[in-house]
């Protein structure tokens, strides 16, 4: 079972469409969440409860909520799990309160392999924070962690790809340097690497997506850069990511393509064995449409796009400012620490947060 604990996000990661669309961040009260979770599990019979959101560990009452849930969840054999966690606010207490029934996997989103590129995408985490978080996990008895990255980010070089492998290797080395690690146990670090797809309504809507050939070359280089059997690498198929990029920035001219591709047998495309890339490409060609036009060219900062008429609060000017800061590798603080004038709350008459409180 899954329950949404908050909506929106204060972090401002420049690649994240949901983080911009769902501003401002709103969190549900811990007591209401506890009651809803209890009713949900009682009425469905689920034995695992996921506290879902874009950034669950940013919930201001998370510790209180976990205490409330642990009053009844272990008795009902209901385990608690958190989605991908931020490495800058992970704690020993968080582990203890989510493992009373059974351990779930730990996934940490580092997103990029070098600090320079993390600054470009505004992923405000450092190696020291990654090291601290993994130390807590290993000391708590975990012997495996998953690190989530993206490939094909703006300004990315092969050095950044090598940084992914180096980060994973440093986590492996960290495990073997700890005196409290389990005797006779090995460590497993899994690199999960997605292909970056530029999305509308984000500061990176202006950038072209890497070609499938470029992404495949980067995937090959990543595999060659990993030299430890303790590190496993998973990555997304570049051709399915290409189609995602096409339709993410597409317009009404793509509607006939979808209908025709369906008639030619393109459905259940999320399943690898059902994905017919050649059929999609032939359909584009037969209808006289160049799919690369939509996702593999830069978009002008003043260009009118198929989504320009949509107003979700955040202004075009703010996206341009964030894009320019990205090119300069300048970061932006979480918006509950200082208002950066994105426009998300302009219809409600003021800032989204009371800045006398640090909610993160």
Where are these regions (language model features)?
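Glycine- and acidic
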Residues: 2, 14-24, 46-54, 113-120, ...
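Canonical Radical SAM [4Fe-4S] cluster-binding loop centered on the CxxxCxxC motif
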Residues: 2-31, 341-359
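Conserved structural-core and active-site-/substrate-pathway-adjacent residues in large, well-folded domains
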Residues: 8-9, 13-16, 33, 82, ...
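Terminal amphipathic helices with adjacent charged low-complexity linkers/tails
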Residues: 25-29, 36, 46, 56, ...
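Ferredoxin-type iron-sulfur electron-transfer modules in oxidoreductases and energy-metabolism complexes
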Residues: 28-38, 42, 65, 321-327
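Conserved SAM/AdoMet-binding glycine-rich loop
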Residues: 39-190, 194, 198
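Flexible glycine/acidic-rich beta-alpha junction loops that bind and position SAM and/or redox cofactors
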Residues: 60, 90-94, 116-121, 151-159, ...
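Radical SAM enzyme core and accessory elements
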Residues: 227-360
